């Protein structure tokens, strides 16, 4: 038996590992082959614009990606993603194994096993489901198995209010997964394809979390442009894992090792996350060339050219933030918005460039980081670290706890944040590290 280090492939003197072709289930198609009904369905969709919510957009992206294995366990608000995929399989539109697990730990374990065999695997969850399967995150990324997980954010218990909050996904931020938020159903669809293309690239080989705000994005319909299957296949070819579990070419995954063998593997995983940065740029540009929709690589810069103040945000509340920025600009207030599209890898240099010239920045925290340095949220810890490393003048930074428990963040609250930033600009210092919006 040959032991293969994740990411290195088989030894040079060994026969080239082969990706398994037809799945060992009678009647299954070969990997990468669409069903006849699926081909006709996607042909009819090509070039159309449909109204669908974020859950449907994630499911359609998995259909276009022609995933091989889906592992599911229901928990709202992400459940509709798996309901749609189950219907696709029942209607003969998708040839995939659908595994209904007994809980999220088993669900993610099954996706890991499928991905280890060379299958394009898809899974997902929300809220406490994300945390229930926590053990598997480091295992999957450490084995360099690029499965995809679609998360519809939900508040952790307590208080059990089931609203949208980013804490669930951010709890996993240091486990070696690519992690990014989508702000609209169109972006959910597009980012799901982009994330697969990045994670499956042999220069990266990392799992991905594509996150959307529960209910605000997952359940509110928006317009989504549907491509042709040929476009998607050209951008995202059939997945080929360099080191699949294959009885014809045995390898070992996850063997026990000596302590001194551990640090090199951890270093390799850290470097893989750094190495993903140029690949994210590359795959985002390739997507624009193939589909005609261009996204910022890491940071959306909105009205920041001459801004003295900036709101730093991620997720769906950025849509409302843009409206607030436009209204404030009409009043002569020089404010802009920096939206983070990826949290891991964190876009340190891109954020530094986006906020150059800005004198004070406020980070919107739709999450809870109890006892942290700012005694508020999680995101500001990365933002302040990134800005502290910048050369020259750095903006003052404060944070705003808003949207917790799934509350809306209306334009009026963004205007309140802008007023606080304006006061800090006049004083030359921030009043406090964290403001709780609606409680002051």
Q: For the regions a protein language model found, what residue spans apply to each?
A:
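Thiamine diphosphate
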Residues: 2-171, 176-177, 193, 213
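Conformationally flexible catalytic loops at phosphate/diphosphate-handling active centers
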Residues: 20-28, 207-300
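Peripheral docking tails and interdomain loops at the edges
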Residues: 27-32, 365-440
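Glycine-/acidic-rich phosphate or pyrophosphate-binding loops and their flanking alpha/beta elements
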Residues: 53-58, 286-309, 322
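Short acidic, glycine/serine/threonine-rich loops at helix termini
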Residues: 81-84, 110-113, 133-137, 158-164, ...
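Short helix-loop-beta junction
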Residues: 86-91, 286, 323-337, 389
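Conserved thiamine diphosphate
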Residues: 163-214, 392-407
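Redox- and metal-dependent alpha/beta enzyme cores, enriched for Fe-S-associated oxidoreductases
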Residues: 298-333, 346-353
């Amino acid at each position: 038996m040959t032991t293969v280090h994740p990411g290195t492939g088989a030894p040079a003197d060994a026969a080239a590992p082969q990706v398994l072709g037809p799945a060992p289930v009678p009647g299954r198609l070969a990997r990468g082959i669409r069903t006849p009904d699926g081909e006709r369905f996607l042909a009819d969709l090509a070039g159309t614009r449909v109204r669908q919510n974020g859950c449907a957009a994630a499911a359609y992206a998995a259909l276009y990606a022609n995933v091989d294995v889906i592992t599911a366990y229901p928990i709202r608000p992400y459940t509709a993603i798996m309901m749609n995929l189950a219907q696709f399989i029942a209607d003969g539109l998708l040839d995939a194994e659908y595994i209904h697990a007994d809980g999220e730990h088993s669900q993610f374990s099954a996706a890991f096993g499928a991905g280890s065999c060379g299958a394009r695997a898809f899974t997902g969850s929300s809220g406490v489901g994300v945390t229930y399967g926590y053990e598997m995150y480091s295992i999957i990324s450490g084995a360099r198995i690029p499965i995809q997980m679609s998360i519809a954010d939900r508040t952790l218990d307590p208080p059990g209010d089931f609203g949208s909050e980013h804490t669930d996904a951010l709890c996993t931020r240091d486990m070696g997964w690519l992690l990014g938020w989508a702000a609209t159903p169109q972006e959910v669809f597009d980012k799901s394809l982009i994330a697969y293309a990045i994670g499956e690239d042999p220069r990266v080989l990392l799992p991905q979390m594509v996150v959307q705000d529960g209910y605000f994005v997952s359940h509110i319909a928006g317009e989504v442009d549907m491509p042709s299957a040929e476009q998607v296949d050209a951008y995202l070819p059939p997945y080929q894992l360099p080191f699949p579990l294959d009885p014809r070419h045995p390898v070992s995954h996850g063997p026990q090792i000596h302590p001194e063998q551990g640090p090199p593997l951890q270093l390799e995983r850290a470097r893989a996350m750094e190495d993903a940065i140029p690949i994210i740029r590359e795959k985002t540009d390739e997507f624009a060339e193939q589909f005609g929709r261009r996204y910022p690589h890491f940071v959306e810069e909105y009205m920041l050219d001459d801004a003295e103040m900036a709101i730093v945000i991620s997720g769906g509340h950025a849509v409302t933030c843009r409206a607030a920025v436009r209204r404030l600009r009409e009043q002569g207030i020089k404010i802009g918005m920096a939206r983070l599209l990826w949290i891991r890898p964190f876009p340190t240099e891109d954020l530094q460039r986006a906020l150059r010239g800005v004198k004070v920045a406020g980070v919107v925290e739709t999450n809870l980081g109890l006892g942290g340095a700012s005694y508020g949220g999680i995101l500001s810890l990365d933002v302040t670290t990134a800005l502290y490393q910048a050369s020259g003048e750095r903006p003052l930074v404060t944070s705003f706890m808003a949207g917790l428990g799934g509350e809306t963040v209306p334009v009026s609250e963004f205007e309140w944040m802008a007023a606080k930033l304006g006061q800090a600009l006049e004083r030359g210092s921030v009043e406090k590290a964290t403001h709780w919006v609606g409680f002051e």
